[in-house]
Amino acid sequence: LAAVSVDCSEYPKPACTMEYRPLCGSDNKTYGNKCNFCNAVVESNGTLTLSHFGKC
């Protein structure tokens, strides 16, 4: 099973769009889009990872 990943190298960003493309984090929390998820990844110092695309 290939690991799913998201490139968060351009983050954090000060503001995210309201675009809804959900991702499920390793914390079992649904993030509304890549920007929200990547900001959380940066805040977690890389401990948060992508579980899968779509809602948890």
From Swiss-Prot:
SMART domains: KAZAL
Subcellular localization: Secreted
InterPro entries in UniProt: Bifunctional_prot_inhibitor, Kazal_dom, Kazal_dom_sf, Prot_inh_Kazal-m
Keyword Secreted: yes
Keyword list, A-Z: Disulfide bond, Glycoprotein, Protease inhibitor, Repeat, Secreted, Serine protease inhibitor
Domain (Kazal-like): residue spans on this chain: 6-56
Annotated S-S bridges: 8-38, 16-35, 24-56
Broad class of the protein's primary localization: secreted
GO molecular function: serine-type endopeptidase inhibitor activity
Site (Reactive bond 3): 18-19
Glycan attachment sites: 45
Any one annotated GO CC term: extracellular space
Keyword field contains Secreted: yes
Domain-related comment: Avian ovomucoid consists of three homologous, tandem Kazal family inhibitory domains.
Name of protein: Ovomucoid
Species: Lophura nycthemera (Silver pheasant)
